[in-house]
């Protein structure tokens, strides 16, 4: 209620989950986790609530972009990641784009989904990820296949990364996500920020 600035926001959201479930759909809770709350008891209470009610919880890691740009202290460290992995095994209903959803043991990692999970702005700009504000093309000016092919020529997006580039790879973050005024509507241009050696 405090975050939304409205009374009974929490109550309505919780009731909404029940309505979704009663309609035969699979309700997901969504939480952003960073270094600031990875070990917070509220996080684990939410996971327990979610499991007890047969929901799933979609986890997004905190990313230093947008309003949090240049706030690298929010990024999960190795200890945070291990803790989140342990919670994944413990609760079994924690979902993340980085993880293999078919792994019954809740251990396997697919890896970062940049370029595989594009974000297209209303202006047609194609970003490698909703959280990585790097433009690889514009669908109003060139075919999507051409844009994707270019994206996969970039070393960081072509090579497997078990870390989320936007929210866990501090080297990538400091090198490519901290440009002045970089945002969804003012993305850095891939051809300008990556060297010739980084693009095959």
Where are these regions (language model features)?
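Radical SAM enzyme [4Fe-4S]-AdoMet core and its adjacent flexible, acidic
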Residues: 1-114, 122-127, 131, 139
């Amino acid at each position: 209620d405090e975050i939304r600035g409205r009374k009974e926001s929490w109550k309505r959201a919780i009731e909404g989950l029940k309505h979704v479930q009663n309609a035969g759909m699979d309700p997901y809770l969504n939480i952003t986790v960073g270094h600031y709350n990875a070990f917070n008891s509220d996080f684990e209470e939410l996971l327990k609530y979610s499991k007890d009610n047969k929901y799933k919880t979609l986890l997004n890691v905190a990313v230093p972009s947008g309003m949090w740009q240049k706030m690298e202290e929010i990024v999960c460290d190795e200890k945070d990641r291990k803790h989140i992995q342990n919670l994944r095994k413990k609760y079994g209903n924690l979902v993340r784009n980085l993880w293999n959803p078919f792994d019954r043991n809740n251990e396997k990692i697919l890896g970062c989904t940049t370029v595989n999970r594009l974000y297209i702005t209303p202006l047609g700009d194609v970003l490698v990820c909703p959280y990585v504000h790097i433009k690889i093309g514009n669908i109003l000016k060139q075919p999507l296949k051409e844009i994707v092919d270019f994206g996969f020529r970039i070393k960081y997006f072509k090579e497997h990364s078990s870390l989320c580039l936007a929210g866990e790879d501090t080297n990538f973050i400091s090198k490519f996500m901290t440009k002045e005024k970089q945002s969804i509507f003012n993305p850095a241009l891939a051809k300008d920020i990556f060297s010739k050696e980084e693009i095959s």
